[in-house]
């Protein structure tokens, strides 16, 4: 499971979960510091862009995952095995935002900014960033690696063109929140997907 209880005591588990998620927030904050505070403020329009990007990646991504799993080309990803129901949803939402914050700030905003400053062209920079993103998702299976490369290409292209990172953070948050909380709400029953 991607998210498991770290302690039998609910309060200790909650503290450990928040501290672990805090590491991802710290990575993003460090990247922002190294960029000398180049961080655009969120705009209301970013919510719409984020929802659109989440749908473009999330809906086909779910179909791709279900097909790959059905054909035996990937492994089943269990988003949560948390055992404290009253903290499960807040912890999963915190992890969703931490993942989005850390990945989009570091792997898209920081990395693409630095590669551009080093004179990399758009194709090389997007390929490098996307393959990096895909590679650290391979523990979820080959289909997750490929899907994250595609996600990285789209999100990287969007950032390269607009310089806006908030739509990416929102989109990533929505994808993870739907996957994590949706799985928990369904009690792990994904038979309606044919898997």
Indicate residue ranges for each PLM-predicted region.
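Small-polar-interrupted transmembrane alpha-helices in polytopic inner-membrane proteins
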Residues: 57-61, 122-137
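Structural signal for the C-terminal ends of transmembrane alpha-helices
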Residues: 30-39, 158-161
């Amino acid at each position: 499971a991607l998210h498991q209880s770290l302690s039998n005591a609910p309060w200790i588990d909650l503290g450990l979960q928040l501290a672990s998620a805090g590491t991802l927030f710290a990575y993003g904050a460090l990247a922002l510091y190294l960029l000398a505070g180049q961080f655009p403020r969120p705009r209301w329009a970013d919510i719409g862009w984020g929802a659109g990007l989440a749908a473009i990646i999330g809906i086909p991504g779910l179909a791709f995952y279900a097909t790959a799993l059905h054909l035996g080309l990937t492994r089943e990803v269990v988003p949560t095995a948390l055992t404290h129901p009253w903290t499960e949803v807040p912890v999963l939402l915190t992890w969703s935002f931490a993942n989005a914050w850390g990945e989009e700030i570091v792997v898209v905003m920081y990395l693409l900014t630095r590669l551009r400053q080093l004179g990399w062209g758009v194709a090389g920079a997007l390929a490098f960033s996307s393959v990096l993103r895909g590679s650290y998702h391979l523990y979820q299976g080959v289909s997750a690696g490929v899907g994250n490369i595609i996600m990285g290409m789209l999100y990287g292209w969007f950032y390269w063109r607009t310089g806006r990172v908030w739509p990416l953070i929102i989109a990533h948050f929505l994808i993870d929140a739907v996957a994590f909380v949706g799985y928990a709400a369904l009690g792990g029953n994904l038979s309606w997907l044919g898997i």
